[in-house]
Design a protein with these regions (language model features):
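Interhelical loop and helix-boundary elements at the membrane-water interface
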Residues: 1-149
Length: 149
């Protein structure tokens, strides 16, 4: 991921689907790929195997896949950050509580970590894309909460 992105940046290539400004900064695709890879590697499994081993990794990744486009579209269509946050929270809770029901994600973790996915959408910085912060914020949260789960 890092090598390919480095080559792309060095050559100033903009891949189909990327924004023009990504020709000289790390792309959202690279940030998302890197953060999801890290989440898959270090998300606690709580001793589970198979699909149930994704009790934290799945909602973190689904959160990125669902909440990011929901909030992005709401912001684009309504230009209302408050509405985007409220609908993002709703979508995030649907994801996290769905994983509580289907995968056994601890309810306490679902309630606490769902807002962190939404908070990850809010920072506007050129240093790191929201595709990464939407994964890293709940991932850091689950790592810090793990002793109490």
């Amino acid at each position: 991921i890092i090598l390919i992105e480095g080559i792309r940046l060095k050559m100033g290539i903009v891949v189909i689907g990327q924004r023009e400004y990504e020709s000289n900064q790390i792309s959202a695709l690279a940030w998302g790929t890197l953060s999801v890879s890290i989440a898959l590697l270090i998300s606690p499994t709580m001793g589970n195997t198979g699909l149930k081993a994704g009790l934290f990794g799945a909602p973190i990744i689904f959160g990125l896949c669902v909440v990011d486009p929901v909030m992005g579209e709401v912001k684009r269509r309504t230009e209302g950050l408050k509405t985007a946050i409220l609908l993002g929270l709703f979508a995030s809770y649907v994801v996290w509580l769905g994983c509580w029901y289907f995968l056994g994600t601890p309810l306490l973790a679902s309630v606490i970590l769902a807002p962190l996915t939404v908070i990850g959408e809010l920072p506007k910085t050129k240093s790191i894309d929201d595709n990464a912060t939407m994964v890293f914020f709940p991932l850091i949260g689950v790592i810090l909460l793990q002793p109490w789960l």
